[in-house]
Amino acid sequence: MTEKILEKFDALEEKERILEAIRENNTDRHHRQRKKPLITPLLFDLHVQFGDTITPSASKIIKNKPHDLKNPKRSVSFKYKPNNSRSDLEESDLRPPILGTMINYEESKLMDHKEENLKSRPISLRYLKDKDETEYANPLPFPQLWSKHLCKKSAESSVPTPKLTNESNASKKENVSPPFTDQHESRTKKSMHSTDHSADSSTSRGKCPPKGITKESELTRNDEARKPHPVKQSIMLPLDCEDLLKNPKIKTIDLRPAVTVHTSMKQSHANPIIFYDTEYVQMLFLTKRFTPYAMKCTERNIVLEKNYEVLKVLFSDEPSAVSEPIQQKHLQVFSAEYAQKSINEKRKKKHDRLVSKKISPNTRYNLSQTFSSLSKKFVGYFDKDVTQGKSYKANRFERFSKTKPPPTRKLTTLPIKYDSKPLKNIFEIHKLNNMTPLDNLLGLRA
């Protein structure tokens, strides 16, 4: 940061030298005609234009004057010079145009304007040594690229001059010397000697900084390469347990057998499963394909359930084989034969139990309770047409009977074969004298 600031001040000094040479020629020609000099005071209001006070460092001025051992804390003195001789002009032309000669030349002209400028423009000047490193890190308030318009105004209006310390400000009155003395001549010679060194140093500065910049850039690149990046830390794999203890935030990948991977997949379902064994894959697909067939049939047949309820009412809550399905699908499973055998045995047991039981043939039932259900269920189930005769004059129901078989009062239940058609059973319904009009309506609707 300091080198960049010094380079910027060097560029400003070169512009000031060119403008001062032009001013000196103009002032030498027209000085006799004009009483007041054209040179403006040496106070540059940086805080007015750019919002902050920035001046050249005191360390730079001390380097430009290394041979000034008698007065190390010499303050800047301004002297008024009424008449300029040719010797002064020649000396000024021979001198290299550097800041030190400019200050000595302007000391003789601007003594009168010093007090007015100090009263009108009180400026608090700061130096690079007095600042901390945090202030150097902040960006500069003035722009890096100077436009021509700003350069002309700043150069014509003012020139920057540093103040060394508070002690120099306090000892200004004591150090002011008369206009023409031997001390002034000795000081000018010393300034000449110091300016030669400063010129050499300024030229060396102009050449050296690029090397320093390249070295700094190389060093910064090496430092950036050496610094551990957070992305690389996440990618690196620890080889020992000590690395995990030192840096517990490092990401680790467990290189373990495939069994641990399957246990972890149960916890995170979003991760894909990768298989390495072909036999395991085949078994998995087979189980997924055939497991639905191995499950029990849990679907409900509503028609069979209703028929079973009707038969329960008819046969006094005794089960019958009619409620069960006649045909069942053979499931293609691994144990299909065993399942089929068990089903056949259960059916045989149920049919044998029904045949062994004796049911009373002369049983009469109340038609008001079961007429509607019987007329709906049994007509479609036995695949026969039921003939209903009705006398409209007497409003009484006649006998329901099957057409083909002879009329009998017994209900016979024979063992049912698995692949046979429904049985042809005979039901006889007797007439009742205790009928109501509501029963007639039910009979008509049925």
Curated annotation (Swiss-Prot):
InterPro entries: DUF4545. Signal peptide: none annotated. Residues 156-169 have a biased composition (Polar residues). Residues 63-95, 155-232 are annotated as: Disordered. Residues 182-199, 213-227 have a biased composition (Basic and acidic residues). Pfam families: DUF4545 (PF15078). This is Uncharacterized protein C1orf141 homolog.
